[in-house]
Amino acid sequence: MLNLRTAIALCICLVLAACASSPKSTMRSARPPILSAEQSRDAAIHAMGLVGTPYRYGGNTVDGGFDCSGLIAYVYRESAGLSTPRTVAQLAGFGDAIPRDELRTGDLVVFGGGRPTHAGIYVGENRFVHAPSTGGEVRLDRLDGPYWSRQKLDVRRP
């Protein structure tokens, strides 16, 4: 009798376990592709060519001007055919997180930590290109400069 109860309990457990499991997903990850080193360099060169372009809130074209995320979207689309998110908050989760000591040309630099506020494109030698503020222009700045060195920095590699 005890064996019959054990067998019934085991069958019930197996049925419940089968009902509780979900089929393996066939969807691929939404993670963007990793750019090659050459594509990353091309993005950095393209970004440097836009230095001096006027800042414009919400802007994402050479003629209309750029804000920081519009600059990033334009550069990666034109130089590598890559679509990027259009807000700094979304850029903070885009691509792979990279330790700062592994920063390479073409990586995204995102400032603000838990609440991202600004982003740019790293171009090497501790410099990055960004569209900083209303009334300004796309410019080249240093990560170790007096202002930017005090900001929380995350690095993302698309």
Give the positions of each predicted feature:
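...with weaker cross-activation on analogous glycine-rich loops/strands in unrelated enzymes
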Residues: 31, 82-143
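Catalytic cysteine-centered active-site loop
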Residues: 33, 53-105, 153
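Short secondary-structure boundary/capping elements
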Residues: 38-39, 147
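Bacterial Sec signal peptide processing site at the extreme N-terminus
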Residues: 13-37
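Sec-dependent bacterial lipoprotein signal peptides
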Residues: 1-19
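Glycine- and charge-enriched low-complexity intrinsically disordered segments
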Residues: 148-158
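A structural motif
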Residues: 40-46
